[in-house]
């Protein structure tokens, strides 16, 4: 992979020479795509002779698309480039090694080891050795003297091993992250027409000249020019900063830009620029160049002694984000907030990360104090013994020997600190998450943000969509009401009047997205494939069941002949299509939610096909006798209607007038069966202490019936099922503002929210998260598929997007993508999340036992024997076992069903429970008893020479080798004990299902044998006899037996035990900190590319002078930028949005007639001024969506405004 800065565009001469091949060059198309509105239309018409002629120049057919000839596609890639923006160059292994070497404790060890190494070669002058006291208390032979350098060299070697292991782990982690990113990118496909067929193509395979089909919810992968569009609206805020949606049409503005979102409508475009030649790619290229320039400046600044800019906030991975104020006043406010934030403790988005950070700091402080006391005691004892008790003078020639002792003491202290500081915790978290993410892919969970995996383990509530998640999303019409008759099964075509049959067929075939269709089954005897919107597919299937052909209708009325299309959105809750009648005038077909469309009908077709009046009492009767019975059977009801316009040109922009006086053709009942595995999955959630709520756009009766089938509600339960309108009435005050107190009375009992908009979903999620009801804050997971589900997905602790039915916008806002759109996969995510939490707790139980024992042994040994029984290199080896191998073994335990039989841990539950504390202290007591017995009585028990008070460079003793070997073997068997943290007795349960664990334990044991038998002086070891090995092994196995003893002690009786590793409590959060956004450093680490994007988009205001096309007016505006976010919102990542503090008033779900009046008035914007609410479309008719987008207007003095006006 290459850095964007290394990619330069081809020179103009080369580009111009290629003009003959396609009739236009890359530069021509780039210049064309920089134009907007009338300028763009003039250029297309004057220079290219219209869009169709441009297609001819690009050798593509606007209807059939490219032929798909490999040679032609390859030529296009060579001439116009590939649709790839090169990612940031990954760090090399050597760079990661250098980063690992920056660890403070390792640096201290390196310095101490080098000093030890240098001084070991010093020999005091002969004859005066006796006066140096303790340094030469016993004579050394030549071999012992020569061995002095070995300890220093061994420490250096151990540090190198630790650094290499750390660098390798970082490298593999980054590789895995990039693999995950590549997987996500490969998942992204786009619809293009090739050789007359619509195919799904990976975004990277799109070339200039492709005819792309665009629809609601798409993220445009390349620049293009509109060929044909239906009510198309684009969100261009990612490039222009304008939050208002831009209406696209051939007459107004046909320019479509990569990185923008389709918020409404559909259409076709010809691709004109891809990759680094697209508008997004150009900005990326500029950012790469500006980054290179800045780095050069930084280097020069350092050489010349220029201080770096202080207005930079360092992120975790060292990327500096340049902060610029939005305007003068906001700049002051943001500066004050920044200062406050700098003083306050940061809250972690990930519950686990927050707890681990706090615990690591506590342990680190304790370790630092213990190591300092250890060094102090060793030095004081040495000084007092030599210079006070024995009254020896300080001789100059003895100074190097004394220094050697001080260095040795210092090394002991540092090794105590190294063992005490739990560096293995981040590694254990990374390994556990990476392992879980990899396995979750097999369970149809594509994790985009690593912390979401762990957060799911704490989930207490799931707000789920109905269609496709709880149901099969395999819709079919099973009942109908046509001509005053209710059919409980599909009627025969002979039963219907020809006129009515034709109206049904035309009303469905024409008034459905042409991308929705029924294809033959993939396997013989299988069900026909439904492509596109599943609701529309159900209606098309209804046409086929009536023995009619919708293809024939669409051939007669191709998409180009559609006069006007009102696409489905959350305000209309319907879709309407207008066509010209052969004899003059227009006909409009409408379809939508039955209660919405029927309210706009004033006539209905009777048995003879004649239109008869349809009054309010008739509508109420139909609702009572037709719609409600269908809904109670779990069917969704849709109404199909039409209207003829015979006189003149109607006011098409006045929807309130157009969408009235309809004639009802039919009402159909659509069945979407509940997935067979869902009831069991919801039962598991209930057992696991997770409340499942259904949030749907369906009728309240339909929603209640489906919820009952799923097991979300059971008859007789005291739970609420509300419609969005009633929900808003209950939670809002007279001003329309949400009151948390009112919401707190509703949400605990709410199980079904029907006829809801995405605003309602966001309000519910926010209300549950912000609620203070109960001891713990709720952890909420949300599913979403529509563009307008973005705010709710972002607000939730974990957002699940649908991989099949979900839009690109929803996927971008999500944390996890369900590749099978199945609720059962969410339950598996819960299981994996809890498993991560348990894996970290297992590792903690193991590591803290080692910490406690190693620190106490080193400290006590130093105080009593002036030496640590465990040498520096041995402790580094133990630390390596702890940090790497144990984390690998314990963090990769597979999950079990028992995880779902426990309640959620909660945000404030400690990482170290009382049971774990009992295990840690219990095993520490056993190990300390054994080690102290061996230290002070081991030589007598084994009948060997004592290793205590040995001279500085004396050879390794069997005594201390036995202590070291016993210590390691006890840790090894305690690793098996640590597999269980909830008091289970059978620690071997499922051990052979985890091959990694078995391999690590076996590998560590073999390594220990090699170290003891062949490690020699570097490891301060000597060979042991067979009987000594058996004793060591017996003591190690005693850990397993002792574990059973500890398990018999009831935890409740040990009330003196305290818990540790709590989350941040409410009392600990200051008032100033309450408003701060939660920051997830793991996410920032994962998505360095997006951080680069954000940084560059802000910095481009000062770097953009390199672009020659900008006029001089731009240079003035750059000096005083007033708009921070002019073009920053490319992928709308949550960590980059700036949440406004003011109260938000979402769109109320009022009477449809009132909404239509507001929306359809000319000049009315869909976003309110303080504006958080922009009504949008939804992919499926069953949900009702409304998007909240942040308004960041392009200021008249901003560089981007200059760019737009001057180009």
From Swiss-Prot:
The chain crosses the membrane at residues 101-121, 148-168, 369-389, 409-429, 844-864, 872-892, 919-939, 958-977, 995-1015, 1029-1049. The modification Phosphothreonine is found at residue 1102. It is found in: Cell membrane; Cell projection, Cilium, Flagellum membrane. Mg(2+) binds at residues 785, 789. Residues 1163-1181 have a biased composition (Polar residues). Keywords: ATP-binding, Calcium, Calcium transport, Calmodulin-binding, Cell membrane, Cell projection, Cilium, Flagellum, Ion transport, Magnesium, Membrane, Metal-binding, Nucleotide-binding, Phosphoprotein, Translocase, Transmembrane, Transmembrane helix, Transport. Activated by calcium/calmodulin. Isoform 1 is detected in brain, heart, liver, testis and epididymis. Isoform 2 is detected in brain (at protein level), heart, seminal vesicle and epididymis. There is a shift in expression from isoform 1 to isoform 2 along the length of the epididymis from caput to cauda (at protein level). Its main location: membrane. One of its GO terms (molecular function) is ATP hydrolysis activity. Residues 294-317, 1159-1181 are annotated as: Disordered. InterPro entries: ATP_Ca_trans_C, ATPase_P-typ_cation-transptr_C, ATPase_P-typ_cation-transptr_N, ATPase_P-typ_cyto_dom_N, ATPase_P-typ_P_site, ATPase_P-typ_TM_dom_sf, ATPase_P-typ_transduc_dom_A_sf, HAD-like_sf. Residues 122-147, 390-408, 865-871, 940-957, 1016-1028 are extracellular. GO terms for cellular component: ciliary basal body; intracellular membrane-bounded organelle; membrane raft; mitochondrion; plasma membrane; sperm flagellum; T-tubule; Z disc. Belongs to the cation transport ATPase (P-type) (TC 3.A.3) family. Type IIB subfamily. Calcium/calmodulin-regulated and magnesium-dependent enzyme that catalyzes the hydrolysis of ATP coupled with the transport of calcium out of the cell. By regulating sperm cells calcium homeostasis, may play a role in sperm motility. This is Plasma membrane calcium-transporting ATPase 4. It comes from Bos taurus (Bovine). The lineage of its organism: Eukaryota, Metazoa, Chordata, Craniata, Vertebrata. The gene is ATP2B4.
